[in-house]
Amino acid sequence: MESQNNNYTLAPLPRLAGFNFRRFEDPGDYQAMVDIIMSNVDDPNNTVTSLKDITADYANITESVPARDMVFAFHAEQPIAYCRSASQWEESSNSWIYGWLMHVHHDWKGRGIEEAMIGWLEDQAVCNHQTLHAGANGMHSVFLPESEQERLNIVINRGYSASRHFENMKRDLAEIPEHPLPEGITVRLAMPSQYRQVWDANVEAFQDHWGATIPPESEYQEWISNKNYFQPYLWQIAWDGDPIAGMVLNFINLT
């Protein structure tokens, strides 16, 4: 049965023999999250993070309520996995999109934790939709790399199908070709007083793209506080006088 807590509707916790589950409690859980993520640092498509990064990310979170939308898995009282449901309004489909993230300790992958957690993520998303957005369109969504074949099999068996494919591409920095700019366009850095203009131009440029959303103010605050991605000294901004004509927001992951 679902339960009510602090005006939230809570889906029942996952159940899996040999493991215990609980919801997120407080920032004291952040270090466990870092340890779980970093156990996979040598895997393909790895994520690199730190306690500072996690703290900054969760300081401005709005797409989730951690106490409602996050669950940890434990074995022998040790945290070995966590997951979080999130939601955003998607203009292009006129729907609430319920996505999720999940990190499982490298040593505990393939033990059934992923499937148990995905089931809970879907249940909690349904609770959130019925409580907050009843009557509106809603759908489950997830981005997965092809290297995560087990998770792909799980979601396919649960009725998901691929709607879009993305490619990660890389090249070295040698012999980068030069292309002349159109007349009247100049490239220069953005000043601190123009960071909001850069953000707004970026959001506007993507409104016609597949899966476009309108980010809340908290995402701007998260963006300017995350030094792994917010590195304006590396940006290449094309200006048409005062308006922004285009941009490449370069960054070097410092973690």
Feature map (PLM): residue ranges:
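Acyl-donor-binding surface of acyltransferase catalytic domains
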Residues: 1-13, 87-183
